[in-house]
C-alpha cells in the first residue's frame, strides 16, 4: 500500500479503458447509428476479469497479473438501449443497433499479494465516466436463424456484440475521492464483448458476454458485425483530469489468456421498458494497463 501511495504522488493522473476515447476519434464513427424508437433494458450484472499491471505503473521490475471481481455499484443497474425496429444486417438477418447508456460496476482485486483487496470501479456510457469525454459504447444484435425478415428481432438465441470504452477507477488510498493517477482508459482499443447465444430482451439471468478482442476506433464498423477484431493485448492508459490521455501505459488485458476469465454475467431480475428517443459490459479494475491477430466477427 505504501508503494502504491508513493506511486500516486509521482504520477498524478488517471484513466484506463477505451471509454476515454470520445475525446479522440470515437465520436467520429458513424458506425451503429441508432434510429428511434428505442427500447431500454435494465438488469443486474457482475464481472470477472484479469489485468496485467505494467511494471512502470506499479514501480516494479515485472508486470503483475491480478484478477478482479465485482458487480453493480449499490443502487445502480446496467442500462442499455436498442432499436425497436430491425433492419437486414451483416448476416442478412433482422438486426438492431444497441448502446450502453450506463454501467457502474464495483469490486476489488481477489488475487493474493500486495494488491489484494484494492477497491476498483468502472463506468461505461457516453460522458458517464470518472473523467470527461468517455466515448459511447455501441453494439448490435442479430438473429442467428435465417428466417424471413419481419422488421423485428424476435428469434432467439441471437448474436450480440458490443465495443466498450471504459473508465476504471482504483481508489488506492481508500478515501472515496477520484484523484489524479487513479483513473485509466482504453483510448485506442475498444473492448469487443460477445454473446452468440443471447436468449432474449432484456438478457435473462445466466447469459454472459466474453471479451474476444478489440476494435480500432477508426474502424467504420465500430460497434457492428464485420469489424476487424484484434486479439492482441488491450492497452489502458492513465487519464488526465481533462479526459485526455497521458500516454502513460498502465495496464493491459489479454483476450487470449486461457488461464483468466473475461466475462460479464447477467444476474437475476432484469426489467424492460419502451422509450421513444434513442448491451453489455465488462470488467473493472484498479491501477493498471499489447499486437494484432484478427477474428472474423
Predicted segment positions?
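C-terminal membrane-anchoring or membrane-association module
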Residues: 283-297
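C-terminal segment of classical bacterial N-terminal signal peptides
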Residues: 18-28
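Hydrophobic helical h-region of N-terminal Sec-dependent signal peptides
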Residues: 12-20, 279
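A short, hydrophobic C-terminal helix/tail in secreted or cell-surface proteins
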Residues: 268-286
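Short, intrinsically disordered, low-complexity terminal segments
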Residues: 12, 28-29
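Extracytosolic secretory-pathway proteins
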Residues: 31-266
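Bacterial N-terminal signal peptides that target proteins for export
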Residues: 2-14, 270, 288
